[in-house]
């Protein structure tokens, strides 16, 4: 990565090489207070993370993304591989079950699958902001964050696409 940035007092790794489509999120939360989406690592700013949207046809991915954005249908995954780990951000607690996100775009890409559009293959990832108080992290893997509260603690704000080189 080589870039040393922070958002919400957590590492921020920009999605270099990805096409970004911004969502209209300004003034949509917190009675119009946009501090959560700040870019100065200031108090009240939320962390940046990525969420792979799974495999499937482009039309299926659009439906899934729409559900995640509009209906807030983030759901815990099946495996929950880190649920029993010690939580690095909340000493004395375990991570627990929840929605997996990552501060690493490459990790999210591994969970995004691909879709074909006009004969080209693309990966799709959601860029989200996450309430830093809601993040749980396994002490032995900084690549995975878990949010085990409500989906109000995860706010999508960009859709990312990248053409895969076959």
PLM region spans:
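Active-site and NAD+-binding cores of ADP-ribose-processing enzymes
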Residues: 7-10, 54-59, 63-84, 109-166
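Structured, beta-strand-rich domain cores
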Residues: 102, 108-109
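Short, flexible, solvent-exposed loop/turn segments with mixed acidic/basic and small polar residues
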Residues: 38-40, 83-91
């Amino acid at each position: 990565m080589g870039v040393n940035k922070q958002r919400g007092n957590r590492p921020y790794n920009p999605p270099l090489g990805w096409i970004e489509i911004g969502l209209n999120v300004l003034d949509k939360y917190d009675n119009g207070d946009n501090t959560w989406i700040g870019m100065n690592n200031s108090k009240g700013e939320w962390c940046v993370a990525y969420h792979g949207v799974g495999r499937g046809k482009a039309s299926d991915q659009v439906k899934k993304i729409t559900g995640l954005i509009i209906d807030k249908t983030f759901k815990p995954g099946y495996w929950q591989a880190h649920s029993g780990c010690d939580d690095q951000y909340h000493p004395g607690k375990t991570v627990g079950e929840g929605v997996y996100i990552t501060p690493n775009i490459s990790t999210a890409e591994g969970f995004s699958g691909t879709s074909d559009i006009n004969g080209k293959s693309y990966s799709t990832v959601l860029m989200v902001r996450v309430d830093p108080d809601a993040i749980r992290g396994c002490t032995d893997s900084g690549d995975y964050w878990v949010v085990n509260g409500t989906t109000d603690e995860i706010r999508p704000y960009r859709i990312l696409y990248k053409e895969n080189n076959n």
